[in-house]
């Protein structure tokens, strides 16, 4: 639910990413600048390769800082004249500017998990006679549940580890949203709505920095989910449609509900809930299995193996699985986990 799934067909695999660049595909030094990620430079197609024409680099990224007469936000390239366009390519210093692409890869290698259990025939006989339970089935359930739970926690902890700090602007302390300071509400419901606004800001930041889409998943502690729920319940004219559908419970489903009809909220049942400080992690997962920041790559599904001790003739069972885990190449550079 919180990461993409790309099955592996062998013990090692490759994840490819294509980047559009300014420059030529023959650039072996890989110094070409990526484009289509943030705002395009209006100068590139209005200049020759030597940047010898009259257009200037655009400056500034926040129109909100634009002031009359200020030069902190400029247009940049505004096109060539007809004469300049006709002259392109007529000399060694007057070539067309070029575009290209690069194919980059990240290697993912399968890793393994394994557990075993042994039991005596006498134990199996007594367990069946007294409790009506099958020893092999019970141990198999224990082993498989443990392995799958460990993989699940590895995924969640990996998400926490690779997540970038949020709340970087308009907060007293960068990375911390203080309900008493940053929200500045008169009562709890207003402070909780301030928290919701900060969550939306972090969701917007994901869309701005990744250019994939606005954040749509939230992992948080039960108290944070309860605060979001109460923000809608306590308000007599709720503007937060859908918040009353949040049902945070550490001991039931980790999916608490949907926030604003769009954001799926998951509760981490193992976070330190009885604490002065709480957390949330905002993320994005697209409709495609390839549109995520983290990929779980199953290779060999959980397999059960039976054996009998060569000396004791007592039964043994074991479980093994193999899988990989890797970041999206666009998420944090070309770094495999």
How does the language model describe each region?
Residues 1, 76, 83, 89-93, ...:
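Sequence/fold signature of self-assembling virion shell proteins
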Residues 166-190:
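Acidic/histidine-rich catalytic neighborhood
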Residues 13, 20, 165-175, 244-250:
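Eukaryote-specific, cytoplasm-facing alpha-helical/coiled-coil scaffolding segments in long proteins
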Residues 26-34, 126-129, 151-156:
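Short, solvent-exposed secondary-structure capping/transition elements
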Residues 1-9:
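Intrinsically disordered, low-complexity regulatory segments in eukaryotic proteins
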Residues 8-11, 108-111, 210-212:
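Extracellular/periplasmic catalytic domains that process cell-envelope and extracellular macromolecules
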Residues 5, 14-110:
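Assembly/oligomerization interface modules of large self-assembling protein complexes
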Residues 7, 135-136, 151-173:
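Short, glycine/acidic-rich hinge or "gate" loops at secondary-structure transitions
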């Amino acid at each position: 639910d919180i990461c993409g799934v790309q099955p592996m067909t062998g013990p090692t695999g490759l994840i490819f990413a294509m980047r559009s660049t300014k420059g030529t595909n023959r650039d072996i030094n890989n110094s070409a600048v990526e484009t289509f990620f943030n705002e395009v430079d209006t100068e590139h197609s209005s200049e020759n390769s030597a940047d010898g024409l009259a257009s200037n680099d655009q400056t500034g990224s926040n129109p909100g800082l634009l002031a009359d007469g200020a030069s902190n936000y400029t247009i940049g390239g505004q096109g060539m004249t007809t004469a300049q366009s006709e002259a392109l390519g007529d000399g060694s210093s007057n070539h067309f500017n070029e575009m290209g692409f690069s194919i980059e890869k990240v290697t993912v290698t399968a890793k393994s998990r394994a557990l075993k259990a042994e039991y005596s025939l006498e134990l199996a006989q007594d367990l069946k006679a007294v409790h009506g339970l099958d020893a092999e089935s019970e141990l198999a359930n224990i082993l498989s549940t443990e392995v799958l739970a460990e993989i699940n926690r590895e995924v969640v902890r990996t998400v926490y580890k690779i997540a970038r700090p949020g709340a970087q602007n308009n907060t007293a302390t960068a990375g911390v949203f203080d309900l008493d300071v940053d929200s500045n509400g008169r009562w709890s419901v207003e402070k909780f709505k301030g928290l919701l606004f900060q969550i939306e800001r972090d969701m917007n930041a994901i869309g701005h920095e990744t250019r994939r889409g606005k954040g749509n998943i939230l992992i948080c502690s039960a108290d944070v989910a309860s605060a979001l729920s109460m923000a809608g319940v306590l308000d007599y004219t709720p503007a937060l449609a859908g918040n009353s559908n949040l049902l945070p419970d550490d001991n039931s489903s980790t999916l608490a509900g949907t926030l604003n009809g769009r954001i799926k909220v998951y509760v981490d049942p193992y976070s330190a809930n009885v604490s002065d400080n709480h957390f949330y992690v905002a993320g994005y997962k697209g409709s495609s299995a390839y549109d995520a920041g983290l990929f779980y790559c199953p290779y060999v599904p959980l397999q059960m193996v039976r054996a009998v001790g060569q000396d004791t003739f007592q039964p043994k069972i074991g479980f093994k699985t193999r899988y990989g885990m890797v970041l999206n190449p666009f998420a944090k550079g070309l770094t495999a986990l």
